[in-house]
Amino acid sequence: MAVGAARFVKLLFFRKGNMVADNVVLQVEGLCFAYPECGVLNQWSVALPAGLALVRGDESSGKTTLLRLLAGELTAQAGRITLQGVCLSDAPTACAHKVFWVDPRSGDLDKLTARTWLDGLPARYPLWDAAALAAHTEGFSLNEHLDKPLYALSTGSKRKVLMAGALASGAPLTLIDEPVAGLDKPSIQYLARALTSVAAQPGRLVVVAHYEKLAGVPWGTVVDLART
């Protein structure tokens, strides 16, 4: 991969309790990705068990790019991503219901009301939890916003709608980017409780990209991204 004066991300990761390989939900091997103007990942590998994983790094460290690669929204130049023993690139359609990802910066959903978007998710995610959605809707104080189009919501309210759907999806791999942007303190506190609850779900990995740990969240794995 030729990338001029590329700068790549190096990986440091820490696991709580020395978790063993037989609990691995997501395996990434030799991942390489570069934009035309810069390199991002070079022979990047990690194994993540069920639970909560924090991808931590400063702005432009590659956090969002990594989530988009894991979601299949970007295609790596090399490497392999395996979810629950299945290579995602070998069976993208079959695995679509196993991965939840919505880029909070995208405007693709903006014309939909929050309710319409949420109502469409159970058909895609067989492990959808309607009771969890009701709890998240209440916890994030979203009831008054459900019939508004997403473009009419504040940054924080839109993120809360997306996270409510993500957390209720039951997807074995759930990807959440910069979760606290625009959130008020009560919503951040509820998010910590919701993530703590999700952490106990067997066989499910929730990957959160953020620049620091969220207080009160039982992170099982912390992956630090740093430019080299």
PLM-predicted stretches and their roles:
Residues 130-146:
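Conserved ABC ATPase "signature" region
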Residues 71:
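Helix-to-loop junction immediately C-terminal to a conserved catalytic motif
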Residues 163:
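Hydrophobic anchor residue at the start of the ABC signature
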